[in-house]
Curated annotation (Swiss-Prot):
Segment forming the signal sequence: none
Record lineage: Bacteria, Pseudomonadati, Pseudomonadota, Alphaproteobacteria, Acetobacterales
Pathway participation: Polyol metabolism; glycerol degradation via glycerol kinase pathway; sn-glycerol 3-phosphate from glycerol: step 1/1
Name of the encoding gene: glpK
The family this protein is said to belong to: Belongs to the FGGY kinase family.
UniProt-recorded name of the protein: Glycerol kinase
């Protein structure tokens, strides 16, 4: 039997291929960044051909580093940045335009139009989602309205819509020569075009948004054999797992029981709680979404708090303000001061997501005095991540009725121990970092491995999970609530900036 499982992890800033063994340990990894394209304020694009090229490159590099071939892999899974929207020509394989990235806000006029006609939550009961620039359905509508020839091709079935999972799968399984046009339930649930209860494309939503059914992919489980990869160097390997990145991290953290939750700290931050086989409708500004579907089992659902900007704020301080040269330098800089000097940063670069859902909010730095230094800004940036996570945790506790016993964490920012301690302090709950922090890729590997019998069951996966470090809260309650009150005040200042 093949010794390993592979995972394609196609994220907002880079593409990676990671090879895992049966214990969930990394055998080999390769990574390559792609360009972020900003044609106008609020617009964010990726080049689909660059993403495809980089994905193929990192697959080859990771295999070469460990001296592996396709025959060493039992299966491959895909995890991807969600909501990022593509439309490509079925006959040529060429994209009709650049991909509209999840944080792109060009659909704000469409959102306002639909909100005026029936309120921000008019489709929430069916889709689990509020009207927002975040979701893929209206991004597709924008492409159909604004890219020459797109609408006619989509209606004729000559243009194919997909999120990044669909784009990669179609290309890897043959492309113009019979590639499989599929998406899994988790990615489909981020389009605003499916009925959560049935996990099927919904005619009412398609009609409301003006989306032709002919361009849509087939919806499949998150763990199932979709076909064989037909491109080198993975030719002949089964493609057998597919999950949006945050759902993949939930699986990678083995949150298989209702009430289990994880928070991923990446470009944005995403807190997901497994709610079992029934969707829980949020009254506190969270999203109701698919968690995963393993083979023929019933789909599992989750509540999600999506935060647009956390790690991206650190990048902004590095790239735009030049406060430091590389991201890890933010921690010693922030540690050089005792507190934030009463400075608060609300990073509403793309509006505010959960639990506020304010597309008209924009970034604010509040509380500045002559006392404030670059170190205070660095500290305020890290703290803003923790405050945003608390906003979401409070909403999640309100919706679920379950108090968070501990927060399982993953993602790039968990290496920042100042942030992890402050997170525990501001939540007044333990924060737990697992030994394996690459849980997004691991979740995709788990989904693929389960589909082909590489792992027998969920207990095999649970046995792989272990704690690296736990941070206990140590901040006095009075201090914690004083800080949080100031944060809430700063958040209010960010609202209603865009007319």
């Amino acid at each position: 039997m093949s010794r390993y499982v592979g995972a394609i992890d196609q994220g907002t800033t880079s593409s990676r291929f990671i090879v895992f063994d049966k214990g969930g340990n990394i055998v080999s990894v390769a990574q390559k960044e792609h360009r972020q394209i900003y044609p106008k304020p609020g617009w964010v694009e990726h080049d689909p051909m660059e993403i495809l090229s980089n994905t193929n490159e990192v697959i080859g590099a990771a295999l070469a580093r460990a001296n592996l071939t396709a025959s060493d892999l039992a299966a491959v899974g895909i995890t991807n940045q969600r909501e990022t929207t593509l439309l490509w020509d079925r006959k040529t394989g060429q994209p009709l335009c650049n991909a509209l990235v999840w944080m792109d806000t060009r659909t704000d006029q469409l959102v306002q139009q639909f909100t005026r006609d029936g309120g921000q939550d008019r489709f929430r009961a069916k889709t689990g989602l509020p009207l927002a620039t975040y979701f893929a359905g209206l991004k597709l509508r924008w492409i159909l309205d604004n890219v020459e020839g797109a609408k006619a091709k989509a209606e004729a079935g000559d243009a194919l819509f997909g999120t990044v999972d669909s784009w990669l799968t179609w290309n890897l399984t043959g492309g113009v020569n019979g590639g499989h046009h599929v998406t899994d339930v988790t990615n489909a649930s981020r389009t605003m075009l499916i009925d959560l209860a049935t996990c099927a494309w919904d005619d009412d939503m398609l009609n409301a948004f003006g989306i032709p059914r002919a361009c849509l992919p087939k919806i499949v489980p998150s763990s199932a054999v979709y076909g064989e990869i037909r491109t080198a160097p993975l030719q002949g390997t089964k493609l057998a797992g597919m999950l949006g990145d945050q759902q993949a991290a939930l699986v990678g953290q083995t949150c298989f029981a209702p009430g289990e939750a994880k928070n991923t700290y990446g470009t944005g931050s995403f807190l997901l709680m497994n709610t079992g086989t029934e969707p829980v409708q949020s009254k506190a500004g969270l999203l109701t979404t698919l968690a995963y579907q393993l083979g023929d089992e019933k789909p599992r659902y989750a509540l999600e708090g999506a935060i647009a900007i956390t790690g991206a704020l650190v990048q902004w301080l590095r790239d735009n303000l030049k406060l430091f040269d590389v991201a890890p330098q933010i921690e010693p800089l922030a540690r050089s001061v005792e507190d934030n000097g009463d400075v608060y940063i609300v990073p509403a670069f793309s509006g505010l997501y959960a639990p506020y859902w304010k597309d008209d909010a924009r970034g604010v730095i509040a509380g500045l005095t002559r006392y404030a230094t670059r170190a205070h800004l660095a500290r305020a940036a890290l703290e803003s991540t923790a405050y945003q996570v608390r906003d979401v945790v409070e909403a999640m506790q309100e919706d679920s009725g379950i108090r968070l016993a501990a927060l399982k964490t993953d993602g790039g920012m968990v290496a920042n121990e100042l942030l992890m301690q402050f997170q525990a302090d501001i939540l007044n709950a333990p924060v737990v970092r697992p030994k394996m922090t690459e849980t997004t890729a691991l979740g995709a590997a788990y989904a693929a491995g389960l589909a082909v019998g590489y792992w027998a069951n969920l207990e095999d996966l649970r046995a792989n999970w272990g704690v690296d470090k736990t941070w206990e809260p140590s901040m006095p309650a009075e201090t914690r609530e004083k800080y949080y009150r100031s944060w809430k005040k700063a958040v209010q200042r960010s609202f209603a900036w865009v007319d």
